[in-house]
């Protein structure tokens, strides 16, 4: 089984071919292809290549499946004994991708 570790949106993801993944929002239309050049690690069965900091010439190709928003995260701030409460919420945008290829 081959897999890779990529960096996008300030986070690291372990990906394998055929996987679906929700990442931070990318400004790419649905159905288009996107390439990730920042590959930290590539593993093909027995052989593992670790970059310093990235693997030279390695890329991961993915197809954008959809764009959307995560479930709402609710935040409550309050001051004790002051009868004051503030309720807020946040929904983060995401891009869902399907990994179509790992090239090392």
UniProtKB/Swiss-Prot annotation:
Keyword match Ribonucleoprotein: yes
SUPFAM superfamilies: L21p-like (SSF141091)
GO cellular component, one term: cytoplasm
Subunit structure: Part of the 50S ribosomal subunit. Contacts protein L20.
Function: This protein binds to 23S rRNA in the presence of protein L20.
Similarity comment: Belongs to the bacterial ribosomal protein bL21 family.
Name of this chain's protein: Large ribosomal subunit protein bL21
Species, as recorded: Pseudomonas putida (strain ATCC 47054 / DSM 6125 / CFBP 8728 / NCIMB 11950 / KT2440)
């Amino acid at each position: 089984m081959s897999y890779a570790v990529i960096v996008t949106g300030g986070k690291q993801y372990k990906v394998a071919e055929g996987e679906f993944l929700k990442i931070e929002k990318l400004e790419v239309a649905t159905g288009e292809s996107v390439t990730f050049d920042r590959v930290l690690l590539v593993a093909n069965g027995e052989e593992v290549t670790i970059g310093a900091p990235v693997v030279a010439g390695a890329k991961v190709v993915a197809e954008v499946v959809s764009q959307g928003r995560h479930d709402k995260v609710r935040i409550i701030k309050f001051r004790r004994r002051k009868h004051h409460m503030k309720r807020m919420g946040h929904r983060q945008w995401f891009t869902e991708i399907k990994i179509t290829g790992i090239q090392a």
